[in-house]
């Protein structure tokens, strides 16, 4: 059943200066609340220039979901943070990844082994999980979340029950744990996993105009929730990727962004900086390139304020030769996280031009359940004295 079209109603005119003042106050408030970190300095400090902002809709197109799990794991270690995970897949896969991610972060922080398990249970208690099977299920969860947000606005109002069940690992075990947020608190992070599966089901069951209209309304609803809920949540949507050399990609007939093979050039906002446009040579086929791009292309991008792409590439030139050759050696890969689209720019607390993060990238890898810099930090040895021939030179007094 298609989403009902909203009926227009008269609105009183509002001066643009008032709207700008309200938006400035909102962005300053979000900046004071702080960013969500991935615990990887290359991504937080260089690529994102601080971290993931609250009150934004962020998309991650990746071959793996370790990056999103790292963001969620790190956020759950902060006090009074709650998360809502919406997934069309079995819950066990997400729970195992989340448990391992939280445990890895605690071990990295130096938490005693005996205190890791109670802290992991306390973190999982702050996660709500909703399993949906299609886009209608996603709409129901978001609608219930919106109703709870409106009910919590009046002072003294009673909040309805949560739309999703909380994860309870073990209610019998007791252990020290940090203070948990109230049970009726809205989530600080809304994570939607395997979004390409929901899009595939949507375009398979509905006509294309109706599907696009549904997604347009979904984009408005996601932005409304990220900006209107009291918690100003970060909405993180996980999307898959396709490549020109992937024989098991989504069905081209139902794929809105199937530009490969049709001669249509790829939109610049979807192209990785590591996948330049093919050479305009008649008959030239770049068989050695692996052109990774987000699934559903611009259809997915219309939902987002910030779009990240995570691609696996060979670690070194030697690994690239091994990957392209037929040798029995195993090539090493790293994951490159880059910003494809930064619709709003980074708010710095003042008017004027905002820093744009497009085409910023970092090479990372998963090490022990954590996302870390792939090449590490190299410390340069301090030169205390420079000697030259005949004793001349050296540090000046």
What are these model-derived regions, one by one?
Residues 84-204:
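Conserved inter-motif catalytic segment of the P-loop NTP-binding fold
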Residues 49, 74-81, 104, 108, ...:
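Short amphipathic alpha-helical interaction elements and helix-loop-helix interfaces
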Residues 41, 70, 96, 125, ...:
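Amphipathic alpha-helical interface elements that mediate macromolecular binding in regulatory proteins
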Residues 1-126:
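The Walker A/P-loop phosphate-binding site
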Residues 1-24, 38, 153-185, 249-276, ...:
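Fungal intrinsically disordered, low-complexity polar regions
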Residues 58, 84-86, 128-130, 236, ...:
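Hydrophobic/aromatic beta-strand patches that form the interior of the parallel beta-sheet core
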Residues 213-216, 220, 224-388:
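Phosphate-binding/switch region of NTP-binding enzymes
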Residues 203-214:
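Short helix/strand-bridging catalytic loops that position acidic/His residues to coordinate divalent metals
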């Amino acid at each position: 059943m298609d989403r009902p079209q909203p009926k227009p109603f008269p609105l009183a005119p509002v001066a643009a200066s008032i709207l700008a003042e309200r938006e400035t106050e909102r962005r300053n408030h979000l900046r004071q609340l702080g960013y969500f970190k991935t615990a990887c300095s290359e991504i937080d400090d260089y690529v994102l220039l601080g971290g993931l902002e609250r009150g934004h809709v962020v998309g991650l197109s990746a071959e793996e979901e370790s990056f999103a799990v790292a963001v969620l794991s790190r956020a759950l270690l902060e006090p009074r943070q709650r998360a809502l995970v919406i997934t069309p897949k079995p819950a066990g896969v997400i729970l195992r990844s989340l448990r391992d991610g939280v445990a890895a972060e605690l071990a990295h922080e130096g938490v005693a082994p005996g205190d890791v398990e109670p802290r992991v249970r306390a973190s999982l208690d702050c996660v709500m999980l909703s399993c949906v099977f299609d886009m209608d299920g996603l709409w129901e969860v978001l609608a219930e979340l919106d109703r709870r947000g409106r009910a919590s606005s009046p002072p003294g109002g009673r909040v309805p029950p949560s739309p999703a069940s909380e994860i309870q690992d073990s209610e019998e075990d007791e252990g020290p744990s940090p203070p948990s947020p109230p049970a009726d608190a809205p989530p600080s992070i809304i994570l939607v996993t395997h979004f390409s599966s929901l899009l595939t089901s949507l375009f398979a069951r509905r006509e294309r105009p109706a599907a696009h209209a549904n997604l347009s309304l979904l984009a408005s609803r996601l932005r409304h929730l990220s900006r209107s809920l009291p918690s100003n949540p970060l909405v993180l949507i996980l999307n898959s990727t396709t490549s020109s050399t992937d024989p098991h990609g989504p069905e081209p007939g139902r794929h809105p962004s199937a530009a490969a093979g049709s001669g249509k050039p790829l939109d610049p906002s979807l192209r990785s900086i590591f996948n330049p446009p093919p050479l305009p040579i008649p008959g030239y086929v770049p068989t050695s390139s692996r052109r990774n791009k987000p699934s559903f292309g611009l259809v997915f991008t219309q939902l987002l304020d910030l779009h990240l792409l995570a691609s696996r590439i060979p670690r070194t030139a030697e690994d690239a030769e091994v990957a392209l050759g037929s040798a029995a050696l195993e090539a090493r890969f790293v994951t490159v996280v880059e910003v494809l689209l930064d619709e709003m720019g980074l708010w710095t607390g003042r008017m004027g031009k905002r820093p744009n993060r497009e085409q910023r990238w970092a090479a990372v890898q998963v090490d022990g359940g954590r996302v870390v810099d792939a090449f590490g930090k190299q410390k340069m040895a301090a030169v205390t004295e420079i000697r030259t021939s005949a004793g001349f030179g050296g540090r000046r007094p």
